[in-house]
Regions:
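Membrane engagement elements in two modes
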Residues: 2-38
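Surface-exposed, hydrophilic segments of mature proteins
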Residues: 26-264
Length: 264
C-alpha cells in the first residue's frame, strides 16, 4: 500500500490564575498568538520550539506527517530527541513571567481516534504517538515524565475525554513537581509527535495495525489538531500543585470547557 502525506496543525493556548488575597476574586492571565491580557501577578508563557540549524527555534505550525522511519525510542541527538526520519518536533515548556512563584499544570490533547486511551492505555496501539519531554545533563538523557512532570496519581494517568469542534479528544495532563520561581522555565513537558509506521491510506480510508481507523464525523486530515494548554496558580498558601489547582479551578477542571468524561 502506498504511504501518503498527512498534514497536522498543532495549536496551543494558555491560561493562568492567581490568588492574591482572601477578600479578592481570582485574577487571570490569558495568552495566545494574537493578544495578551494580564491582571495580577501570575503570568505564564507557553513556549513551543523545534530544532533548527542553530539550535531550538520557534515552532512552525502545519507540519506534514509521514509514517515514521526508524524508532522514536532509538538513537537521540544532542537535545535528547530522536534522529528517526519523519519525527515531528513539538518541544513544549512553560515560563513563569510573573513576579511570584507559581504552580503550573499543562494539558496535552490528542484526537481519540488516534490514541488508545481509556481503559487500556496501550501506547503501542496509538496511531499518533507523543513523546514526553527530555533533558540532557552531562551527555546523559533522562525523561521528565514522573520526575519534573507528574503525569500520574495512584499509578493512573491524569486523564479525561472531551469534545472540541465536534472532534473527540483524549486529554493527558501533568503538574510540575515544584513551584516555579519568577523568571524561570520548566523542563520540557512534551517533545514531539510521530505517526505510527503502520499508518496507511487507501481508497479513501485510513488504516493502522491492519485495521481501519474509525474517524469522527467531519474529520479533516488537513486540519488535525493536538491542543496544548497550561494553567498556573500563585504558590503562596499552597503545599503542592494539585492542592493549588483544585482550589483555584475546582476539581475535574476542563480548560477547554464543555463536558468531560472518563476522569481518572
Amino acid at each position: 500500500m502506498k504511504k501518503k502525506i498527512t498534514a497536522i496543525s498543532l495549536c496551543a493556548a494558555l491560561l493562568a490564575i492567581a490568588i492574591v488575597g482572601a477578600s479578592l476574586a481570582y485574577f487571570t492571565d490569558t495568552d495566545n498568538k494574537t493578544n495578551t491580557f494580564t491582571v495580577g501577578n501570575v503570568d505564564i508563557d507557553l513556549i513551543e520550539q523545534q530544532r533548527g540549524k542553530e539550535g531550538l527555534e520557534p515552532f512552525q505550525q502545519n507540519k506534514k506527517l509521514y509514517p515514521i522511519v526508524g524508532s522514536a525510542q532509538g538513537e537521540k541527538d544532542q537535545y535528547g530527541m530522536p534522529i528517526a526520519k519523519n519525527y515531528v518536533d513539538k518541544v513544549v515548556a512553560v515560563q513563569n513571567k510573573g513576579s511570584e512563584k507559581a504552580y503550573i499544570r499543562a494539558y496535552f490533547a490528542i484526537p481519540s481516534a488516534l490514541d488508545d486511551g481509556y481503559e487500556n492505555f496501550t501506547a503501542g496501539q496509538n496511531v499518533l504517538h507523543f513523546n514526553f519531554g527530555k533533558k540532557v545533563e552531562n551527555d546523559t538523557i533522562t525523561s521528565t515524565e514522573g520526575k519534573e512532570w507528574i503525569w500520574k496519581h495512584d499509578d493512573k494517568w491524569n486523564y479525561f475525554e472531551t469534545t472540541m469542534g465536534g472532534i473527540r479528544y483524549n486529554v493527558y495532563y501533568a503538574d510540575y513537581y515544584q513551584a516555579v520561581d519568577a523568571g524561570e522555565t520548566t523542563e520540557q513537558f512534551v517533545q514531539g509527535v510521530y505517526l505510527d509506521k503502520s499508518f496507511d491510506r487507501k481508497d479513501g480510508k485510513c488504516y493502522a495495525f491492519g485495521k481501519e481507523i474509525k474517524l469522527d464525523d467531519g474529520w479533516n486530515w488537513n486540519a488535525v489538531q493536538c491542543p496544548v494548554f497550561a494553567v498556573a496558580c500563585q504558590a503562596e498558601g499552597f503545599d503542592n500543585a494539585s492542592e493549588a489547582m483544585t482550589a483555584a479551578f475546582g476539581a475535574n477542571y476542563n480548560p477547554w470547557g464543555g463536558t468531560a468524561t472518563n476522569w481518572q
